[in-house]
């Protein structure tokens, strides 16, 4: 049985397209008797809760296993110890015993030495986690983290209040990882794995060692690196028989400015593609550009798996223009507000509902206010129920300036929503047939996009026809049987 290990820096509940793609791929793999494991490298004390939420929300299959570097070595350390190490907790208790507590509220307290008056401890509680900042000469020197009353981490600071090191503790209170932090750039430096008596010069070496311990080097094991920042860690391992692939989920070109410049992480992957078994992209157009620019042979096209939703009755009667994405520059949301302005000028009954969060939220809020669109353009934040929100829309728009595939557009088409999108690399032109199952608009043509929105919302029959054909297209293009066969063929090469 093939075992795949899909590698990414982290998992969380409110993650977007790439996480969704990995979780869906894992489920399809498992349905086809291929293990679909996930591998992460970040530190989260509450990963158990995160995985439960992902499973409860149906985003993650309950059969999917996740292996995390810290959890892996913590569990190993737990097996070596049976008695609790109370050294640090006793020290903290003694410090608090000889002090005066002044409460700011139920969650925050400060402790002062009852004789010298020195400021000793700042304590704050956040749900199940309690954090203690320890002070000497009025400067923070350590931060202790407790989760359900168990010490799990200590941060160490210098006299400038800069983080210099992190210590990680197992369930019995024993140190299992110590790592130094470069104060000038925040990079992880020397890392020490206590029970294995191992020293690593940097985080890449440490994570590569974790992969080597986790994944047996045989022909049945396959590593699939989805997170571009995690690629150097996979590349560093000494595996000879286990296969290695990298998936590029986005446009590899930089700043969508047509300069030909390539993003640093994606460029590193492509320049080192000869050292792995292959690079996978989501569209044929991207594959052709990469072959042309990098003279590569081992680049393959396999689209993301799509959850084929059940066929349901059309409800395209709403005057709601929908958009689901992160609020980041590459999504072209300033153009979307310009489109909204022109549409609302013609029909004040039309509303734009934008779901998602991100760094541009304040900028978009200000733009909405400046253009006096508060009654018609709603920023509704992150939703964990995208399907139900899309069902409310009369049509869906995309002003994105760069795409890897466009999962939210695909989901909208599956739900029979007419889609109007800027024609950008890569994605929309792979599945939108202009005037047949949606509309492809020349990039940044605000006037034309506005006209098409008004046309679709005014002519419900047209909107329903586009929606029906859109669903047919997606089901034909993204058939799971076709895609799983591509993966299986790749594993055999």
What do these predicted regions represent?
Residues 250, 285, 305:
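Carbohydrate-associated surface elements
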Residues 273-298:
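A short, active-site helix/loop in glycosyltransferases that binds the activated sugar's phosphate group
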Residues 319, 323-345, 352, 359-365, ...:
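A conserved mid-protein helix/loop that constitutes part of the nucleotide-sugar donor-binding site
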Residues 369, 389, 448, 455, ...:
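A short, well-ordered alpha-helix in the C-terminal region of glycosyltransferases
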Residues 382, 401:
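Aromatic "clamp/platform" in nucleotide-sugar-dependent glycosyltransferases that forms part
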Residues 387, 394, 416:
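A short alpha->beta transition loop at the rim of the catalytic pocket in nucleotide-sugar-dependent
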Residues 418-422:
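Short hydrophobic beta-strand element within catalytic cores of glycosyltransferases
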Residues 433-435, 439-446, 454-461:
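Conserved acidic donor-binding segment of nucleotide-sugar-dependent glycosyltransferases
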